[in-house]
């Protein structure tokens, strides 16, 4: 299994990576089934979703369950398909034509269901997973509190064991709970003797209630409510994982959520580019389609480039997880693998959400004044996608996680930055190698390798200057994370170009040879 973050230490293109062109016919069929479901059953009622028509969203999710879209990652033994992350990625990508539905769908299949997949006991899995896979039960995830947003461990919800040791009594309030208005099952985090613990709480438990829907900037049709816990009696059998180890569940569930968010951003970005490309060829100004003008074509090109890199990044990460999970002996080992790829998960989340935000902004610009009006779908996309930079930990927090995690691993020796720093210092004196100078795209392989060295060198200089206090230098850490994030995206796109057999790529090769 490849170490998380080790892409910084490897030569670009030295190892094969999973690319979208390797999707199997079955995986492509899953994507097509998802796309057809959303286009035929969700998009036609998008105005009703936006108006928050009562009971519509849970009805659509249950229909998705009937079609089989909720069961991809649920084990076959629990009524699911037992598929991997690549399959889940293509499902997530194709669920994005309606923003509010996508949020509800991803919440249920991701942070709503997967905690039981990874940490549930056999009894918990048998009790809940079949119902979650079919849509009979719908799920939500309750971590955030009024005073515990980015600082999730500051939560004040508590759980006390009853004298007979049969129940925990939960008290507290969670906020911004996606799917909270209709969910049947919540993964709730509360402290037992000051230590974070996860619980499976059914909405039917006495003392569980929800507050009014939040009035949001976007994703109007998704449910976002406070969850109120008043002396809720939860059986000890509903403790998820170990008492006092809830932080592990919370953070690793967010790692899964970050990857899924990145996958969703791929689909939404594709949708926006398709809409915009169609519009600019239909919109006439100065006697021509505006799509004929260079500045508009440049916008389409910039969006397409960023999409190519994002798609490459997300599928490479999914492939890494599938490869790792295929050799895992049990759920505990899979959890360690999620933690191993925490850096890649944060990169997928930050890069994905910011690419989508860029493309949604360019879509508005290409539509001109019409893009600013709610008669055009790009206006809704612009509002809906803004929350992605807040979901699953803000992009600022994730930037700190990217560089902070890599520094911790370098300090502990998990990643051998010291040897690489020595190599870099030597190269500064003798010169940097040009191993691919004569190869097609070889120059870019060398450039990416140089940027990787730059990121490691900046980390080393930062540690030398600030020592242990480097974790307080947020501006530096964020800048390093941006270098790492962009480098990872460029490398993934480059590896895809080198591995793939794209007709356009082959044409470019022929043209280049003829010019010689």
What are these regions (language model features)?
Residues 1-106, 123-127, 131-138, 150, ...:
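Amphipathic, small/basic residue-rich leader segments at the start of a protein or domain
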Residues 2-4, 40, 68, 76, ...:
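Alpha-helix capping/hinge segments and adjacent helical runs
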Residues 42, 104-123, 149-152, 161-164:
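N-terminal glycine-rich flavin-associated loop
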Residues 46-51, 308-351, 364-367, 464-467, ...:
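C-terminal helix-coil-helix/basic helical segment that borders enzyme active sites and/or dimer interfaces
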Residues 138-161:
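A gly/ser-rich beta-alpha-beta helix-loop segment of oxidoreductase catalytic cores
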């Amino acid at each position: 299994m490849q170490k998380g973050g080790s892409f910084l230490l490897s030569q670009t293109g030295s190892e094969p990576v999973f690319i979208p062109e390797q999707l199997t016919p079955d995986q492509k069929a899953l994507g097509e089934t998802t796309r057809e479901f959303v286009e035929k059953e969700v998009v036609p009622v998008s105005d009703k979703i936006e108006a928050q028509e009562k009971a519509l969203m849970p009805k659509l999710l249950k229909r998705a369950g009937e079609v089989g879209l909720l069961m991809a990652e649920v084990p076959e033994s629990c009524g699911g398909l037992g598929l991997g992350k690549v399959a889940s990625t293509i499902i997530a990508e194709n669920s994005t034509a309606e923003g509010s539905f996508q949020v509800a769908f991803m919440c249920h299949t991701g942070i709503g269901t997967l905690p039981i997949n990874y940490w549930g006991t056999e009894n918990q899995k048998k009790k809940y997973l079949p119902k979650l896979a079919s849509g009979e039960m719908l799920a939500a995830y309750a971590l955030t509190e009024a005073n515990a947003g980015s600082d999730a461990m500051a939560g004040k919800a508590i759980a006390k064991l009853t004298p007979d040791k049969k129940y925990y009594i939960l008290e507290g309030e969670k906020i911004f709970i996606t799917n909270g208005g209709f969910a049947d099952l919540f993964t709730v985090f509360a402290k037992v003797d000051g230590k974070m613990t996860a619980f499976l709480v059914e909405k039917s438990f006495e003392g569980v209630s929800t507050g009014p829907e939040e009035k949001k900037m976007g994703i109007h049709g998704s449910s976002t409510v406070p969850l109120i816990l008043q002396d809720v009696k939860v059986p000890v059998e509903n403790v998820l994982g170990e008492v006092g180890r809830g932080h592990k569940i919370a953070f690793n569930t967010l790692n899964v959520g970050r990857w899924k968010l990145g996958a969703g951003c791929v689909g939404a970005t594709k949708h926006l580019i398709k809409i915009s490309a169609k519009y600019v060829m239909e919109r006439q100004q100065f006697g021509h389609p505006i799509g004929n003008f260079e500045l508009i074509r440049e916008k389409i090109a910039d969006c397409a480039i960023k999409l190519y890199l994002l798609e490459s990044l997300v599928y490479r990460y999914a492939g890494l997880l599938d490869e790792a999970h295929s050799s895992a002996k049990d759920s505990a080992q899979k959890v360690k693998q999620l933690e191993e790829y925490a850096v890649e998960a944060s990169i997928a989340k930050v890069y994905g959400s910011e690419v989508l935000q860029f493309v949604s902004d360019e879509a508005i610009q290409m539509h001109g004044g019409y893009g600013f009006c709610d008669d055009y779908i790009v206006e809704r996309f612009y509002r809906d996608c803004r929350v992605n930079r807040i979901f699953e930990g803000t992009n600022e927090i994730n930037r700190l996680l990217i560089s902070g995690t890599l520094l911790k691993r370098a300090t502990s020796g998990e990643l051998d930055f010291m040897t690489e720093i020595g190599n870099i210092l030597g190269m500064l004196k003798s010169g940097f190698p040009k191993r691919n100078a004569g190869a097609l795209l070889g120059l870019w392989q060398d450039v990416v390798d140089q940027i990787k060295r730059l990121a490691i060198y900046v980390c080393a200089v930062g540690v030398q200057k600030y020592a242990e206090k480097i974790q307080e230098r947020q501006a530096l850490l964020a800048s390093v994370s941006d270098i790492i994030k962009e480098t990872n995206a460029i490398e993934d796109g480059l590896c895809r170009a080198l591995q793939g057999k794209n007709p356009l790529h082959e044409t470019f090769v022929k043209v280049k040879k003829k010019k010689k």
